[in-house]
Design a protein with these regions (language model features):
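Extended, helix-rich architectural segments
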Residues: 1-167, 496-504
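Extended, charged amphipathic alpha-helical segments
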Residues: 4, 222-361
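Extended hydrophobic-aromatic, low-complexity segments
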Residues: 49, 323-324, 343-346, 418-419, ...
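Surface-exposed loop-to-helix/strand elements on domain peripheries
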Residues: 109-114, 303-419
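Extended, regular secondary-structure scaffolds
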Residues: 134-245
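Short coil/turn segments at secondary-structure boundaries
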Residues: 135-137, 151-152, 270-277, 344-350, ...
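Intrinsically disordered or highly flexible coil/loop and linker segments, enriched in small
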Residues: 261, 265-279, 336-347, 379-401, ...
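Activation/maturation switch segments at domain boundaries
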Residues: 421, 425-504
Length: 504
């Protein structure tokens, strides 16, 4: 099997086991120790991580070790086949996790209404957050980590929510990292961002360092700029796919390399069978005769007494059935390591119901893995949300706090939509806050926006008060035996109903 440790600009000295955390015992970074911490401790670790990240990214793009495959015998027949399953699994999970945009909804403990949250969601949508989330998920799945940076937009004109005072970006993880304190809590103490000036020489990058209150620029090993900033927190947040910062297909790389080698050898076997070696027995053939065979496809031989002349071929055909059995076994290992569902084969053409298909084809394992990724994403997204809200409070007068917002990542669009509609219809009729009916079933991609759009109808039906809030239990309109709101009946209707009841 080809060695996969070699990468552009360096070597991976160990098997890939996730990215290394960058930690320091320092509790803060300032002008006095910024060079010592960043250049002396953080950059060497980041260089190792960067080599691995670039290898994984190139692997995802199709630059895989089988392309450097060589053969000692029959070197003229050397096929190099890349079955890019790394691209397959990353593309699948990217769509599965970010196909429906991340949404913000009002939390149960929020004191205000959800209108301001809806304005925030719309404003971020105008800023392209959905596309940035997709890019962020791709980096997380490729190399186990991604970054989101949020800074005040210097071009903001005060027209929130038509425009936002937020400058949101997703830098490449090989050009950014977070420095953590190595003590209890592993608190982040600094952000480092590389600004490339010469893509052929990483050593010429401008290094930007953010602390909660200061900003530094390091150029050629010297601090060339130092100033304070008013944000009061770190602007960049690290998103980890898992605690080890290991990419989705990273554990399966040996299996993926073996699949590429097997497929390449299978094609070599077919080519060698077709282009088999000719053996001439009891006859002499010169180069001109061989050229004539290639041109005409036939030749004439003469036999002598006791020495019959013959021509045969040395051809050993590869057993394709055994090769396919081995390939299927390795594909099953790949699917197990990446929790990929089975989407091919005749086994899918059955009359099973949705639940049976989900379990049989591995979608339950996919959903369990996705739930782990979602929990890690929400943890980091809440930190990014705190930075966004801090900037909005300082520039746009927003009163939102991070505790007022719940983060939703809608998924499982293969579920039965009719069941979701039935759950929604049942919940909306119960004496509960109507917003729970919008957020619980997973029917709406943006539950908060759907709830805000439905408010006039909920008010008209008595589910919400005139102020747009759920009435208190004692204020809930009473229902008669037929389920009709008695509070909505006129005096005459109420009197007629009472007389009819007395007559009965």
């Amino acid at each position: 099997m080809a060695e996969y440790q070699m990468v552009v600009g360096g070597f991976l000295n160990e098997p890939l086991t996730g990215r290394r955390p960058i930690e320091t015992p320092e509790t803060e970074i300032n002008r006095a120790n910024v060079l010592k911490v960043v250049m002396g401790k953080a950059e060497p670790i980041h260089l190792l991580n960067k080599n691995e990240i670039r290898f994984l990214h190139n692997y995802y793009l199709g630059s895989q070790p089988v392309l450097q495959r060589t053969k000692e015998y029959h070197a003229e027949i050397t096929n190099r086949i890349v079955e890019n399953h790394a691209n397959e699994c990353v593309g699948f999970y990217t769509g599965y996790m970010s196909g429906t945009p991340c949404s913000y909804v009002r939390s149960e403990t929020a004191t205000g209404d959800g209108e301001e949250i809806a304005r925030l969601s719309n404003a971020l949508q105008y800023e392209g957050k959905d596309a940035l989330d997709r890019r962020l998920w791709q980096w997380m799945l490729e190399c186990g980590q991604g970054y989101r940076i949020v800074l005040p937009d210097k071009g903001y004109n005060g027209n929130y929510p038509d425009e936002t005072p937020l400058l949101v970006d997703v830098p490449d993880p090989d050009m950014a990292y977070v420095i953590y304190n190595s003590g209890i809590g592993h608190k982040p103490i600094a952000n480092v961002l590389h600004i490339p000036r010469n893509y052929q020489n990483d050593l010429n990058d401008l290094i930007c360092v953010y602390t909660p209150n200061q900003y530094f620029e390091i150029d050629n090993g010297k601090v060339t700029k130092s100033e304070n900033h008013s944000l009061g927190m770190l602007p960049m947040v690290e998103y980890k796919l898992n605690p080890e910062r290991m990419g989705l297909f990273e554990p399966a790389i040996p299996v993926l390399d073996a699949i590429n080698d097997l497929e390449s050898n299978r094609l070599d076997g077919v080519a060698q069978f077709i282009q088999s070696i000719m053996v001439f027995t009891n006859c002499l053939v010169d180069k001109d005769a061989l050229d004539q065979v290639k041109e005409l496809g036939a030749m004439c031989l003469k036999s002598t007494s006791g020495l019959p002349a013959s021509v045969s071929q040395i051809a050993n055909e590869l057993d394709q059935q055994q090769s396919q059995t081995l390939l299927d076994s390795m594909l099953n290992v790949y699917r197990s390591l990446t929790a990929m569902p089975s989407t091919t084969g005749s086994e899918n053409a059955t009359s099973d119901n949705v639940g049976a298909v989900i379990v049989r084809n591995g979608w339950n394992h996919t959903e369990a893995r996705a739930q782990q990724y979602e929990n890690m994403f929400k943890y980091a997204e809440r930190q990014s949300l705190s930075v966004m809200l801090k900037i909005l409070r300082d520039t746009a007068g927003s009163k939102l706090m991070a505790s007022d917002i719940n983060i939703k990542l809608p998924r499982r669009q293969y579920d039965n939509q009719q069941s979701k509609v039935q759950i929604f219809a049942q919940m909306i009729q119960q004496p509960i806050d109507p917003q729970l009916a919008f957020t619980t079933p997973g029917l709406f991609p943006d539950p908060q926006a759907a709830y805000e759009m439905s408010k006039p109808f909920l008010i008209a039906s008595g589910k919400l008060g005139e102020d747009g809030k759920a009435p208190k239990p004692q204020e809930q309109p009473k229902q008669d035996a037929t389920g009709t709101n008695a509070g909505n009946m006129t005096d005459k209707q109420s009197t007629d109903t009472n007389k009819e009841t007395e007559g009965k």
